[in-house]
């Protein structure tokens, strides 16, 4: 329930002109209250004016938007375009306003990007857009005299692609005086060359970087990864994501005569020097028989591990089942591996070791069939902490799903299930794993009936708290959604370049 203070704040910020004319007469401790009220009601003019006059030393957006005694609603999942742009404009006004000398830290981290915006305008400013607005503001202010006499540290989760690379570089490496100093605890990179990636990381302050995501269209091989880790260094890094094929050997690298992967050994040693690293995602890298080489040197147990589609063999699964990381795992993705069919006892030993900590388990396209359901029920039953279970793309019938759902109801903390379209809904003889065209060609009416049956299973078990869904093409990714046009252009250019290279090769052969 909202407090009388907050109701009064809402009434006040609804009169934009009145607030702006009287900001100098408002007590400092009311600014946070008025800010949340203006953000909630999307009074962008008031939001900007509040930041322009901000009388406190710190402005931390996530702290101001989180639940409090005056207003219990959490607004951190509102990446409202109008309000966030107003915040940045207000910071710029603050810098240029004479007499404004208290603000030292502006923290824009902690905003959660979601699929459906609850703000009145319904328009989101995602991580890439926020990066662009911040970089543009920094560039516009460079060279301006700073009335405060000291730069304002602006903390932000940066998302850098080819589309905003030049602007971000200029913001991070100003040529002259800069009233805003960008601090980057988290960085996501996409559609960059290896050289561009190294450049932006060097400027972003890798010594303070906590999370690094290098994804999709950053074409790295093992030589690049080794260079990245040895030359840049990330002593504070807690989370690392590497792109597809990041552990492939460089094209000019001759295989070791004794079969050792010296580059991987070197990379693993560099990772072992990161004493705070607890999250590692290396999906779609070929790591057959190499998991022990990669993970055994790590000194700190991993909490998050993504090994989806890494072509793991029995040796790899055996190592995972017995290594020191497993008892600490909270999030595990082993999608794309035929685990239950090929290595059932080893895989279920792994689940047993992780049972007391595992919160999120993803087993998409693992060829789990009806004949495996009883084993899956036994394997999952000890996982008392499990909150999310995702198993899209597995050829399971409606009856098998009903049995599995009945067992999942027994997991007390489970809140979210992503289940596949039942195989009953596809034509006879459908081949798994399915391509994007095939996966969408199913009998919607049959699916609706089975999905309703599955929800009825939950209701009969008094588990209305469990949300179920079938996202055909995977869970919503706000970063991909926001930059889809740029990624499409990048892929088309890469395809064109490949065709040109192929054509030249044919001409040389002739």
Curated annotation (Swiss-Prot):
Top-level taxon of origin: Eukaryota
Keyword DNA-binding: no
Keywords: Leucine-rich repeat, Repeat
InterPro entries, alphabetized: LRR_dom_sf, PRAME_domain
Ranges that cross the membrane: none
Keyword match Lipid biosynthesis: no
Similarity remark: Belongs to the PRAME family. LRRC14 subfamily.
PANTHER family reported for this sequence: LEUCINE-RICH REPEAT-CONTAINING PROTEIN 14B, SIMILAR TO PREFERENTIALLY EXPRESSED ANTIGEN IN MELANOMA-LIKE 3
Protein name: Leucine-rich repeat-containing protein 14B
Gene: Lrrc14b
């Amino acid at each position: 329930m909202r407090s009388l203070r907050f109701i009064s704040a809402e009434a006040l910020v609804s009169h934009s002109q009145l607030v702006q004319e009287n900001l100098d007469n408002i007590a400092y401790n009311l600014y946070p209250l008025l800010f949340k009220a203006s953000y909630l009601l999307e009074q962008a003019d008031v939001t900007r004016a509040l930041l322009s006059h901000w009388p406190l030393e710190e402005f931390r957006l996530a702290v101001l938007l989180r639940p409090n005694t005056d207003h219990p609603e959490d607004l951190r999942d509102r990446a409202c375009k109008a309000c966030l742009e107003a915040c940045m404009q207000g910071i710029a006004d603050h810098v240029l306003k004479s007499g404004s000398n208290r603000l030292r830290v502006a923290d824009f981290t902690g905003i959660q990007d979601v699929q459906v915006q609850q703000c009145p305008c319904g328009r989101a400013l995602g991580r890439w857009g926020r990066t662009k607005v911040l970089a543009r503001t920094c560039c516009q202010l460079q060279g301006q005299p700073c009335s405060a006499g000291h730069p304002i540290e602006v903390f932000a989760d940066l998302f850098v692609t080819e589309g905003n690379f030049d602007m971000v570089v200029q913001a991070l490496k100003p040529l002259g005086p800069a009233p805003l100093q960008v601090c980057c605890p988290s960085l996501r990179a996409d559609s960059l060359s290896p050289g561009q990636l190294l450049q932006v990381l060097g400027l972003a302050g890798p010594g303070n970087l906590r999370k690094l995501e290098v994804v999709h269209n950053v074409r790295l091989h093992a030589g690049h990864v080794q260079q990245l880790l040895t030359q840049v260094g990330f002593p504070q890094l807690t989370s690392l994501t590497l792109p597809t094929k990041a552990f492939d050997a460089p094209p000019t690298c001759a295989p070791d005569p004794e079969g050792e992967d010296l580059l991987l050994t070197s990379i693993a040693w560099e990772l072992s020097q990161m004493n705070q690293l607890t999250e590692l995602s290396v999906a779609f890298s070929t790591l057959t028989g190499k998991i022990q080489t990669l993970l055994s040197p790590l000194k700190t147990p991993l909490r998050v591990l993504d090994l989806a589609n890494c072509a793991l063999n029995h040796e790899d699964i055996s190592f995972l089942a017995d290594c020191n990381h497993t008892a600490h795992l909270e999030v595990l993705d082993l999608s794309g591996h035929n685990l239950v069919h090929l290595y059932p006892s080893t895989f279920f030993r792994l689940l047993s070791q992780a049972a007391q900590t595992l919160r999120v388990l993803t087993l998409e396209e693992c060829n789990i069939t009806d004949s495996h359901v009883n084993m899956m029920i036994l394997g999952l039953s000890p996982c008392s902490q499990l909150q999310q279970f995702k198993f899209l793309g597995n050829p399971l019938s409606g009856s098998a799903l009903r049995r599995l759902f009945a067992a999942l109801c027994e997991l007390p903390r489970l809140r979210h299930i992503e289940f596949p379209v039942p195989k009953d809904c596809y034509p006879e003889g459908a081949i798994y794993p399915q391509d994007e065209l095939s996966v969408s060609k199913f009998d919607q009416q049959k699916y609706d009936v089975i999905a309703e049956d599955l929800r009825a299973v939950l209701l009969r078990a008094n588990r209305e708290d469990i949300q179920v869904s079938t996202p055909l093409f995977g869970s919503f990714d706000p970063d991909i959604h926001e930059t889809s046009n740029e990624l499409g252009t990048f892929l088309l250019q890469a395809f064109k370049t490949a065709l040109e290279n192929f054509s030249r090769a044919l001409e040389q052969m002739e």
